[in-house]
Amino acid sequence: MVAWLVLLMVMIVGYDVMMRYLFHSGSVALQELEWHLFALIFLLGTPYTLKHDSHVRVDIFYKSQRVSDRQRAWIDLFGGLFLLVPFCLLIIISSIPFVTSSFIAGEGSPDPGGLPWRFLLKAVIPLGFSMLLLQGVADMLRCIFVLRQKKD
Protein backbone atom coordinates (compact mmCIF):
# COMPACT_ATOMS: atom_id res chain seq x y z
CA MET A 1 0.00 0.00 0.00
CA VAL A 2 2.80 2.39 0.88
CA ALA A 3 4.43 1.78 -2.50
CA TRP A 4 1.22 2.97 -4.18
CA LEU A 5 1.27 6.08 -1.99
CA VAL A 6 4.83 6.78 -3.14
CA LEU A 7 3.79 6.41 -6.77
CA LEU A 8 0.78 8.67 -6.20
CA MET A 9 2.96 11.27 -4.48
CA VAL A 10 5.47 11.25 -7.35
CA MET A 11 2.67 11.82 -9.85
CA ILE A 12 1.15 14.64 -7.77
CA VAL A 13 4.52 16.34 -7.26
CA GLY A 14 5.25 16.07 -10.98
CA TYR A 15 1.87 17.55 -11.85
CA ASP A 16 2.25 20.32 -9.24
CA VAL A 17 5.73 21.27 -10.49
CA MET A 18 4.56 21.29 -14.09
CA MET A 19 1.57 23.50 -13.25
CA ARG A 20 3.71 25.91 -11.21
CA TYR A 21 6.62 26.34 -13.61
CA LEU A 22 4.95 25.95 -16.99
CA PHE A 23 1.57 27.53 -16.32
CA HIS A 24 2.33 29.70 -13.24
CA SER A 25 -0.59 28.12 -11.42
CA GLY A 26 0.08 26.65 -7.99
CA SER A 27 -2.30 24.90 -5.66
CA VAL A 28 -2.20 25.00 -1.87
CA ALA A 29 -4.32 21.86 -1.72
CA LEU A 30 -1.89 19.91 -3.91
CA GLN A 31 1.08 20.98 -1.82
CA GLU A 32 -0.71 19.98 1.37
CA LEU A 33 -1.66 16.67 -0.23
CA GLU A 34 2.04 16.07 -0.91
CA TRP A 35 2.83 16.69 2.77
CA HIS A 36 -0.03 14.44 3.87
CA LEU A 37 1.08 11.63 1.57
CA PHE A 38 4.65 11.95 2.84
CA ALA A 39 3.37 11.67 6.42
CA LEU A 40 1.34 8.58 5.52
CA ILE A 41 4.32 7.02 3.75
CA PHE A 42 6.49 7.57 6.81
CA LEU A 43 3.91 6.50 9.41
CA LEU A 44 2.76 3.39 7.54
CA GLY A 45 6.11 2.50 5.97
CA THR A 46 8.13 2.45 9.18
CA PRO A 47 6.50 -0.71 10.62
CA TYR A 48 6.87 -2.44 7.24
CA THR A 49 10.55 -1.49 7.11
CA LEU A 50 11.09 -2.88 10.61
CA LYS A 51 9.32 -6.11 9.64
CA HIS A 52 11.68 -6.61 6.71
CA ASP A 53 14.78 -5.62 8.74
CA SER A 54 15.57 -2.75 6.39
CA HIS A 55 16.19 0.05 8.87
CA VAL A 56 19.50 1.84 8.79
CA ARG A 57 21.99 0.56 11.32
CA VAL A 58 25.73 0.36 11.66
CA ASP A 59 26.14 -2.76 9.55
CA ILE A 60 29.91 -2.70 9.83
CA PHE A 61 29.47 -4.04 13.37
CA TYR A 62 26.04 -5.64 13.26
CA LYS A 63 26.38 -7.63 10.03
CA SER A 64 30.02 -8.61 10.46
CA GLN A 65 30.86 -12.29 10.70
CA ARG A 66 32.25 -11.78 14.19
CA VAL A 67 28.76 -11.08 15.56
CA SER A 68 26.78 -14.27 16.20
CA ASP A 69 23.02 -14.66 15.80
CA ARG A 70 22.68 -14.70 19.60
CA GLN A 71 24.61 -11.42 19.90
CA ARG A 72 22.41 -9.86 17.20
CA ALA A 73 19.36 -11.08 19.11
CA TRP A 74 20.67 -9.43 22.29
CA ILE A 75 21.33 -6.17 20.42
CA ASP A 76 17.85 -6.21 18.86
CA LEU A 77 16.18 -7.13 22.15
CA PHE A 78 17.99 -4.35 24.00
CA GLY A 79 17.17 -1.81 21.28
CA GLY A 80 13.53 -2.85 21.17
CA LEU A 81 13.04 -2.95 24.91
CA PHE A 82 14.88 0.22 25.88
CA LEU A 83 14.58 2.38 22.76
CA LEU A 84 11.72 1.36 20.46
CA VAL A 85 9.02 0.47 23.01
CA PRO A 86 9.45 3.59 25.20
CA PHE A 87 9.62 5.86 22.15
CA CYS A 88 6.48 4.35 20.59
CA LEU A 89 4.58 4.51 23.88
CA LEU A 90 5.62 8.15 24.35
CA ILE A 91 4.39 9.10 20.87
CA ILE A 92 1.15 7.10 21.18
CA ILE A 93 0.27 8.46 24.63
CA SER A 94 1.22 12.05 23.86
CA SER A 95 -0.52 12.09 20.46
CA ILE A 96 -3.93 10.91 21.66
CA PRO A 97 -4.95 14.26 23.24
CA PHE A 98 -3.54 16.02 20.18
CA VAL A 99 -5.65 13.85 17.85
CA THR A 100 -8.73 14.06 20.09
CA SER A 101 -8.71 17.86 20.16
CA SER A 102 -8.22 17.89 16.40
CA PHE A 103 -11.26 15.61 15.92
CA ILE A 104 -13.40 17.69 18.29
CA ALA A 105 -12.50 20.90 16.47
CA GLY A 106 -12.95 19.28 13.05
CA GLU A 107 -9.55 20.69 12.20
CA GLY A 108 -8.77 21.50 8.62
CA SER A 109 -6.10 23.49 6.88
CA PRO A 110 -5.56 27.05 8.13
CA ASP A 111 -4.60 28.09 4.60
CA PRO A 112 -7.17 29.32 2.09
CA GLY A 113 -7.65 26.62 -0.51
CA GLY A 114 -6.09 24.01 1.77
CA LEU A 115 -7.37 20.54 2.50
CA PRO A 116 -10.16 19.96 5.01
CA TRP A 117 -10.19 17.07 7.49
CA ARG A 118 -6.65 17.40 8.81
CA PHE A 119 -7.83 15.48 11.87
CA LEU A 120 -7.92 12.30 9.76
CA LEU A 121 -4.24 12.62 8.98
CA LYS A 122 -3.44 13.26 12.63
CA ALA A 123 -5.30 10.08 13.58
CA VAL A 124 -2.69 8.10 11.65
CA ILE A 125 0.02 9.18 14.14
CA PRO A 126 -1.06 6.88 16.99
CA LEU A 127 -2.08 4.22 14.45
CA GLY A 128 1.31 4.18 12.75
CA PHE A 129 3.23 4.10 16.01
CA SER A 130 0.91 1.38 17.36
CA MET A 131 1.72 -0.73 14.30
CA LEU A 132 5.42 -0.01 14.84
CA LEU A 133 5.09 -1.02 18.50
CA LEU A 134 3.36 -4.29 17.56
CA GLN A 135 6.05 -5.09 15.02
CA GLY A 136 8.71 -4.27 17.61
CA VAL A 137 7.09 -6.65 20.10
CA ALA A 138 6.98 -9.36 17.42
CA ASP A 139 10.67 -8.81 16.72
CA MET A 140 11.51 -8.95 20.43
CA LEU A 141 9.63 -12.25 20.72
CA ARG A 142 11.67 -13.55 17.80
CA CYS A 143 14.84 -12.45 19.64
CA ILE A 144 13.74 -14.26 22.78
CA PHE A 145 13.11 -17.38 20.69
CA VAL A 146 16.65 -17.16 19.25
CA LEU A 147 18.13 -16.66 22.73
CA ARG A 148 16.24 -19.64 24.17
CA GLN A 149 17.54 -22.03 21.55
CA LYS A 150 20.36 -24.28 22.64
CA LYS A 151 23.84 -23.25 21.61
CA ASP A 152 25.44 -25.39 18.92
Language-model features: locations:
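Alpha-helical transmembrane segments and membrane-interface helix-loop junctions
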Residues: 1-152
